[in-house]
Amino acid sequence: MMILAWCIAWVLDFIIGDPQHWPHPVRWIGRLITFVQRIVRRYCPGDKALRIGGGVMWVVVVGATWGVAWGVLALAQRIHPWFGWSVEVWMIFTTLAGRSLARAAQEVERPLRENDLAESRIKLSWIVGRDTSQLQPAQINRAVVETVAENTVDGIIAPLFFLFLGGAPLAMAYKAVNTLDSMVGYKHEKYRAIGMVSARMDDVANYLPARLSWLLLGIAAGLCRLSGWRALRIGWRDRYNHSSPNCAWSEACVAGALGIQLGGPNNYFGERVDKPWIGDAQRDISVDDISRTIRLMWVASTLALALFIAARCGLSGLA
């Protein structure tokens, strides 16, 4: 039944994703972060106090998320096993973000194909932190491909990894870790101190999933009739061409699969950030690379699901 719950949750994400007006735990986690952050800022003046307060905030948010998820699941199981199973499916479903990621990328791709640069810049600004107001088509394509490649780890592979390790409650706790990083894990002045622990713990949580994504995306590239060997080679070569210890693993693999370059200079919060280039520019990036990257994401996520199911079945057999 556990394996069936994983599969149904994955299929639900593939088909419907996260409908905009449905209740979603990540929104609740976000409200909790906002509430706790307000308290920390009120009582923790100075950078040192903010770093400590940020660490306490991380423990409170992640611990509360795991505890509530475990408690709700246990209560649902006591009411009725089938009800508990249904709640488990729903929890797992909410930790996966493949369809939402694909939909967001396609929202940028659509006006770009229609040469509506202004609309594609607006839609892109909803999913990236960089300044999109002056981006040209090639830069927009690059930003979308990078976002899909990076979030293949955060949105699918990592939640499945923690689901395998500790069930739905641990997968929910991972979403709290990831949401904390998304909200406060920045290096600019406002968040540098309070978000330090959140940023570093997100790096720790994604350490193994990011490296697994290199292998899965490389295999996916071969299955998608792209260059799997080049994906693995470039992915390994450029795996550290990023300020994050994790992001370049998936981005470099996708760049290698497609034969394009990612990375390079961007503007964040009014500041120019010169990132290393990732991949080799064997051709110019195009709008079609967005749909190719989405396809790589889905194939890699299918492989991840199959891998963790096989591992779980293997462990069950040993037990």
UniProtKB/Swiss-Prot annotation:
GO biological process, alphabetically ordered: cobalamin biosynthetic process
Keywords: Cell membrane, Cobalamin biosynthesis, Membrane, Transmembrane, Transmembrane helix
Entry GO terms, CC: plasma membrane
InterPro entries: Cobalamin_biosynth_CobD/CbiB (IPR004485)
Pathway(s) per entry: Cofactor biosynthesis; adenosylcobalamin biosynthesis
Transmembrane segments: 56-76, 82-102, 153-173, 204-224, 296-316
Topology within the bilayer: Multi-pass membrane protein
Pfam families linked to this entry: CobD_Cbib
Residues in the signal sequence: none
Membrane keyword on record: yes
GO molecular function, one term: threonine-phosphate decarboxylase activity
Compartmental location: Cell membrane
Its job: Converts cobyric acid to cobinamide by the addition of aminopropanol on the F carboxylic group. However, the true cosubstrate could be (R)-1-amino-2-propanol O-2-phosphate, leading to cobinamide phosphate.
NCBIfam families: cobal_cbiB (TIGR00380)
Annotated family: Belongs to the CobD/CbiB family.
Protein name: Cobalamin biosynthesis protein CbiB
Species of the source: Salmonella choleraesuis (strain SC-B67)
